[in-house]
Amino acid sequence: MESQRNILLIGLLFVSFLLWQQWQADKAPKPVATESSLVANAANSHSADVPEADTGVPAAVTATSKLITVKTDQLDVQINPIGGDIVFAALVSHKMEQDKDQPFVLLEQTKDFTYIAQSGLIGRDGIDSSAKGRAAFSTAATEYTLAEGQDTLEVPLTYVADNGVTYTKVFVFHRGKFNVDVDYKINNTSAAPLQVQMYGQIKQTIKPSESSMVMPTYRGGAFSTQDVRYEKYKFDDMAKSNLNQATLGGWAAMLQHYFVSAWIPPATDSNTIFSSVSAGGLANIGFRGAVYDIAPGATQEISSQFYVGPKDQKALSAISDTLNLVVDYGFLWWLAVPIHWLLMFYQSFVGNWGMAIILITLTVRGLLFPLTKAQYTSMAKMRNLQPKLTDLKERFGDDRQKMGQAMMELYKKEKVNPMGGCLPIILQMPIFIALYWVLLESFELRHAPFMLWIHDLSVQDPYYILPLLMGVSMFVMQKMQPIAPTMDPMQVKMMQWMPVIFTVFFLWFPAGLVLYWLVGNIVAITQQKIIYAGLAKKGLK
């Protein structure tokens, strides 16, 4: 009977997790704007100067302003010389679809969709603003390629203002990396002082997330400040309230499941993280940097970083100590992080993510074996106590208080813990949920094959074979458990339907997660046989 209740407990916890997850998606708390006194002056500097979002392909992209193409070992990028915006970015080492050679396109600008990275100089003498328009840069070439043996590639853009001041905007690409340095060099050859402020923003057409209850993915904004290490800021949040948070350092990003684009200004600079939504349905999130005063004859350099690539925790941590938090493992992050590390460790040896998941399963089941043994021992003792419990029920009838006291005395005398059978189940659920988020958030598992028909462990089994096998394994486990004659008939019927219900739920779960549960069931069946054989020798059935 205890085993049957445990399976019901699994079902209850499982459904509760799904409902809680959906509630979190609908009722996520909104961040509260706060300002640090150290950088309060930067919060409102030239906030209206940042160019508004444009819709569609800008008219400035004409035959006389040909896009600048940049190719590295990781990125295929196009830069618009009007403003120097990154209007296209394809990730060379990541495919759009597993069975096609087309690289994954993260940034693009078409007639119907915009997702670009914009940067510029605003302020009193800025060359980019909603009122003045954008600077028209010139460049020595329109095609740049990172050559063999070359570690960095510089793409310089030059603009000479009416007052003779030269503005040089340099994009620096690195071999093996997805981050781009964006550097401004201002040579003030005029007779008057200049005042400028750098900004960087990401613009994206508001597009619904391809999320579901069992596969909740996030598409929207995120930011970090000195007061808020990491906060998602959904498109709905942007439409309701504009961000305007002063901070030292910080970053602003757009997330799209396994991928992220982010502006990361210098950690020691006074910046303002902002967001807005245009009437045309474009969401903006970005930063405004510190204000620089440049004396006549002086030269000033202003820098920032832009990342456009996968949610690679190692690469993101090297850029900012909080940028890796975009890999959001939820409230069980403290458990998911070591699981991810162990998964990576196993994969480095076996070279197969499916085998790594199997090894994770064996590790978890091995660690929990002492508790599992105690669980089945407790269940066997409870079954042997059934005649005595029945006698107590007949003796005390409806007097629940006396019956409860008598039962507790009996448990104490026989050294039986009535809750002993639940502990392993309760301990397994956090591990299951943490692994669920690891599979959902870790880009390494995108398009990761296992064997045979499983070509991508991060999506559902295309033929539903694993969920069906998982359901069969649950049915076998159920049949191995004796049903107590005193068990409620309604509970018996619910138990009979549990394998079917779980199979239906797992049809849409990532194949890697179903593999974990299936292998776990097979190991549990094996452990159950071994434990029952040992209990039989002790006279426990």
Swiss-Prot record:
It is a multi-pass membrane protein. CDD domains: 5TM_YidC_Alb3, EcYidC-like_peri. The chain crosses the membrane at residues 6-26, 325-345, 349-369, 420-440, 457-477, 500-520. It is found in: Cell inner membrane. GO terms for biological process: protein insertion into membrane; protein transport. Pfam families: 60KD_IMP, YidC_periplas. Keywords: Cell inner membrane, Cell membrane, Chaperone, Membrane, Protein transport, Transmembrane, Transmembrane helix, Transport. One of its GO terms (cellular component) is plasma membrane. One of its GO terms (molecular function) is membrane insertase activity. HAMAP family: YidC_type1. Belongs to the OXA1/ALB3/YidC family. Type 1 subfamily. Interacts with the Sec translocase complex via SecD. Specifically interacts with transmembrane segments of nascent integral membrane proteins during membrane integration. Required for the insertion and/or proper folding and/or complex formation of integral membrane proteins into the membrane. Involved in integration of membrane proteins that insert both dependently and independently of the Sec translocase complex, as well as at least some lipoproteins. Aids folding of multispanning membrane proteins. This is Membrane protein insertase YidC. It comes from Shewanella baltica (strain OS155 / ATCC BAA-1091). The gene is yidC.
